[in-house]
Amino acid sequence: MKTPRHPSMGKQHGSALVVVLLIFALAFALSVEVVYRQHRVQTRTANLLDWDYRYQYAIAAETLAIQGLIDDFEDDQRNNELVDDCSKEKWAGPFSFPYEDSVISATVQDLQGRFNINSLVVFNNNEYQRDPEAIARFEALLAGLLPPSHARYASTLANEMADWLDTDTLVNGPEGAEDGEYRLRRTPNQPILDESEFRALRSFDAELADAINAMQKPTPQATTNNPATLRFWDYFTALPLGTTLNVNTAPKAVLEAWFAPYNAQAAAQTILQDRETNPYTDTNAILALPAFSNLAPDQRSALQAQLGVGTSHFQVVIDVAMASGLSRLVTRIQRPSQGDTRVFSRSLVPVLSALEPACNPD
């Protein structure tokens, strides 16, 4: 006679099967998560290693560029011709070469051929004071470089930038802006370290930024040698007070703006033509141009003190391309007439366009 099966035993077997299935599902889910996390860690590690490879290659290229600038300066000393221009310098051309599994490209720019925003103030009586002549230059440059729809901002931006730099907290004129106009931050009231602070001005709003970005948006024709678009930021820099403007590398827009207070913009075209074949070796030749014949002695002395034919400040832009990606290093270098050549700024920036043109744009 068969023993009758207890009803609860079937339920226990069913519950055990469900528990086994749940354990199996949980183990499978945990395994998938472990594999996923391991893959993510491996991918992240590989990306970091690739990034580090590109960065180390860029640093190596930076070291090579520094040595090239030192060699160039020593050659100039031997030749007794301390001149930096865009036609004869070894550093003036773009460079590109393969190295192991990468391609390294680089260009060098003369920062003293750009408009020094810090020149808007002078240090006098233990404080930084506005320089009306420099502000007029800055306004003239902005008027020519800003998008046509925003050219009216030139005067406002020039005065706001001067207020950003000067020591006092007084708004100078209806177009200025001091601490009270800025929330969550205060004006530095001293020279800036980078021209990007220009973006912090009250009137440099999102609309203006978008207009500038649209104006210099990269095109398919853009290359290292031919950017194919106007680069707004290529015309500005932030260097120590008293740094001279190198007339042998300054683009036409900067030269015209610099001479605007003297109504001598015509000198810019003459300088551009002359330096193509015979770079200027001293500033006396510049002041001898007909456009400056009507300058008063004090104006002549002041202008001569602001101009130069060589440079001590350079920018090196380095792109390192590998199968894994592209990195860009921007290094700024000081090469003084006495003392060691040194890096005073180094930053990794997004690669949003072609390399900046070698030397400076015309």
Language model features: what each stretch is:
Residues 2-9, 15-362:
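Compositionally biased linear targeting/interaction segments
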